[in-house]
Design a protein with these regions (language model features):
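Heptad-repeat alpha-helical coiled-coil/4-helix-bundle sensor or tether segments in soluble regions
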Residues: 62-119, 126, 187-232, 240, ...
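N-terminal extracytoplasmic segments of bacterial inner-membrane proteins
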Residues: 24-55, 144-175, 243-253
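Structured alpha-helical bundle/scaffold domains in large eukaryotic membrane-trafficking regulators
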Residues: 51, 55, 171, 175, ...
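C-terminal amphipathic alpha-helix
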Residues: 117-146, 227-269
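N-terminal signal peptide c-region/cleavage motif recognized by signal peptidases
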Residues: 13-18
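Hydrophobic faces of stable alpha-helices that mediate helix-helix packing
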Residues: 33, 37-40, 67, 74, ...
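Extended amphipathic alpha-helical interaction segments
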Residues: 117-205
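Positively charged n-region of N-terminal signal peptides that target proteins for export
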Residues: 1-5
Length: 269
């Protein structure tokens, strides 16, 4: 396990959330709305890790940066929805996210009192459901098969953080039975989606190269899940490996965004 942790540390890259940028097209809106899904889970994960005093400086930075990015993305998505035709359903979806976010943010920002894990998990899940609805509506609006890959690859970012969140919940509570079904479901969804992305006919050679790296990292990461099945909890290892996967999937989602936007330009030229 020491070797595993050491190698994991070498593989882990420092996660930097993208700087704010105006959303100009559906492809970008898909990417950035999908990022909201990831942030909903990342915030809960960081909250639980903070409760366990794991990587406190990095975790506190994650909480602040993720909350700021969530709010900025909401602002940009609202502006984008106001700039396109027939966007009433998008506006309603964004308003629902905003309402869920207000409740979530209120609990997250209570510095002097720690909310129960179940409260944070429930709020993160409700926010996730609202964000998922917006992404699906944007994919439907795009009406392109290539838009699916932006959605699916972006969803892998969310799953990386959801896995870390649920693993952290098990580590904090000591109750594997309570959260294990959700954890295993997230792992299964990641497996299935990764295979679908690998088989995408829209992949460039570079996308295939990046996906192969993710597959290698993902298989490596599963060692951490096996240790949990043996009764050993290693939240720090999972924190680091899921960060690496998040970074890689973020790059891949940007590549799919560019592919989708190119197909749109070709179709309308």
């Amino acid at each position: 396990m020491k070797t595993f942790i050491y190698i994991t540390c070498l593989l882990m890259a420092f996660t930097v959330l993208p700087t704010n940028a105006e959303i100009n097209n559906i492809s970008q809106a898909l990417n950035e709305s999908g990022r909201l899904r990831m942030l909903s889970q990342r915030l809960a994960k960081a909250y639980l890790l903070k409760a366990m005093d794991i990587q406190p400086e990095k975790v506190n930075k994650q909480l602040t940066d993720s909350a700021n990015k969530f709010e900025q993305n909401l602002i940009e998505l609202k502006a984008f929805s106001n700039s396109i035709n027939n966007s009433d359903t998008l506006k309603v979806a964004i308003d629902i996210i905003d309402l869920q976010w207000q409740d979530y943010r209120k609990v997250l920002s209570q510095a002097d009192t720690r909310a129960p894990a179940d409260t944070i998990l429930a709020l993160s899940d409700r926010t996730l459901v609202a964000c998922e609805s917006l992404v699906m509506q944007l994919e439907k609006t795009a009406q392109r098969q290539s838009a699916r890959w932006v959605n699916l690859s972006g969803r892998q970012r969310m799953l990386s953080q959801r896995i870390a969140k649920l693993y952290s919940a098990i580590s904090l509570s000591g109750n594997k039975d309570l959260y294990d079904d959700g954890l295993q479901q997230a792992v299964h969804e990641f497996d299935v989606a990764l295979q679908a992305l690998i088989n995408s006919p829209d992949n460039t050679h570079f996308v295939n190269h990046k996906l192969k790296k993710v597959a290698t990292q993902w298989n490596f990461s599963k060692q951490g899940f096996k240790s949990l099945n043996k009764g050993n909890s290693t939240p720090l290892v999972i924190f680091m490996t899921t960060e690496s996967i998040l970074n890689q999937m973020n790059d891949i989602t940007a590549l799919y965004e560019a592919i989708d936007n190119k197909k749109k330009r070709i179709a309308t030229s």
